[in-house]
From Swiss-Prot:
Matches recorded under SUPFAM superfamilies: Ribosomal protein L6 (SSF56053)
Domain of life: Bacteria
Family: Belongs to the universal ribosomal protein uL6 family.
InterPro entries per the UniProt record, alphabetical: Ribosomal_uL6-like, Ribosomal_uL6-like_a/b-dom_sf, Ribosomal_uL6_a/b-dom, Ribosomal_uL6_bac-type, Ribosomal_uL6_CS
One family name in Pfam for this protein: Ribosomal_L6
Complex and partners: Part of the 50S ribosomal subunit.
Function: This protein binds to the 23S rRNA, and is important in its secondary structure. It is located near the subunit interface in the base of the L7/L12 stalk, and near the tRNA binding site of the peptidyltransferase center.
Keywords for the protein's UniProt record, in alphabetical order: Ribonucleoprotein, Ribosomal protein, RNA-binding, rRNA-binding
GO molecular function: rRNA binding; structural constituent of ribosome
Keyword Lipid metabolism part of the UniProt annotation: no
Protein name: Large ribosomal subunit protein uL6
Biological process, per Gene Ontology: cytoplasmic translation
A cellular-component GO term for this protein: cytosolic large ribosomal subunit
Organism: Delftia acidovorans (strain DSM 14801 / SPH-1)
């Protein structure tokens, strides 16, 4: 059995988990998420804890049990606490502004870059050089943050660009004559 799947997922108060034949639905204060259930994994709910077991002894079923456990755990944490990614803009004149579900970036191009946030994702700018992406779906939050960063990734000589707040950019040494 997968080591990840051995630990059950605790369901906190205020979170409702329903398991149908092929769908797992999680509802909480942060929203509602659903995940397709894999046929190789048996999910059981006992006393507020979800346990995951492979249906057979195949390697694929063993791997999927750990994957399903982590996906459901991310859903439970997402609807109860939520996920967030923090990005910072480094460079002279680099600015970000959020209005509603739109993000406008002025990052040294001849034109402004605009992003439309998908449903369930909120974006805020605490300062003009910081972007905060929040949501219940961990994958969607990470994907949106990666798409924003990909517009202008940090360059290796001065470090200018959009980076994650905890990212360390290795600065290269310039060419010497």
């Amino acid at each position: 059995m997968s080591r990840v799947a051995k630990t059950p997922v605790a369901i906190p108060a205020g979170v409702d988990v329903s398991i149908k034949d092929d769908q797992i639905n999680v509802k909480g204060t942060g929203g509602a998420l659903s995940q397709a259930q894999n046929a190789l994994v048996k999910i059981s709910n006992n006393e507020g804890k979800l346990s995951f077991e492979p249906v057979n002894d195949s390697r694929e079923a063993n791997a999927m049990s750990g994957t399903m456990r982590q996906l459901v755990n991310n859903m439970v944490v997402g609807v109860s606490k939520g996920f967030e990614k923090k990005l910072s803009l480094v460079g002279v004149g680099f600015k970000a502004s959020a209005s509603g579900s739109k993000l406008n970036l002025a990052i040294g191009f001849s034109h402004p870059v605009n992003f439309e946030m998908p449903a369930g994702i909120t974006v805020t700018t605490p300062t003009p050089t910081e972007i905060l992406v929040k949501g219940a779906d961990r994958q969607a939050v990470g994907q949106m943050a990666a798409e924003i960063r990909a517009v202008r990734p940090p360059e290796p000589y001065k470090g200018k660009g959009i980076r994650y707040s905890d990212e360390k950019v290795v600065i290269k040494e310039t060419k010497k004559k």
